[in-house]
């Protein structure tokens, strides 16, 4: 269950690419991946910018394993109050532990130096659906 943590710890750097979202439309994404505490945690600093909307998403996330060994994302961003914990339910799929709206984040590394980061949510009790997704490549 910690494969993603190990892969990201071995591939720190700045990732840049493009994304798209139902509300945001097309955007340019930048995610800085930093290994901390000897690879026991990863920080992800994510920004999304577009010409029409400017800076539209700022997020600071910590990926780490819980005491039980399950991966967790601890997310703070402009759209959420405080810090929200997302717990991995299957490889790369993190469900919100608590919150007003059903939500999840899907993080994958389909190949070396490539990272995808998707936000899924629903404004009602329906199953979350993909709302925003970035595909970025390591550039530095």
Predicted feature descriptions by range:
Residues 16-20, 44-50, 73-76, 93-99, ...:
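Short beta-strand segments that buttress and anchor functional surface loops
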Residues 121-140:
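Edge beta-strand at a domain terminus
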């Amino acid at each position: 269950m910690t494969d993603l943590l190990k892969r990201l710890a071995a591939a720190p750097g700045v990732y840049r690419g493009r994304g798209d979202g139902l509300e945001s439309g097309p955007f340019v994404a930048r995610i800085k991946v930093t290994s901390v505490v000897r690879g026991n945690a990863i920080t992800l600093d994510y920004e999304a910018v577009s010409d029409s909307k400017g800076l539209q998403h700022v997020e600071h996330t910590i990926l780490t394993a819980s005491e039980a060994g399950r991966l967790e994302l601890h997310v703070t961003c402009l759209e959420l109050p405080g810090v929200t914990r997302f717990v991995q339910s299957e490889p790369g799929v993190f469900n919100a532990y608590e919150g007003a709206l059903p939500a999840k984040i899907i993080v994958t590394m389909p190949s070396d130096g490539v990272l995808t980061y998707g936000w899924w949510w629903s404004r009602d009790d329906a199953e979350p659906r993909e709302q925003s997704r970035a595909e970025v490549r390591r550039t530095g």
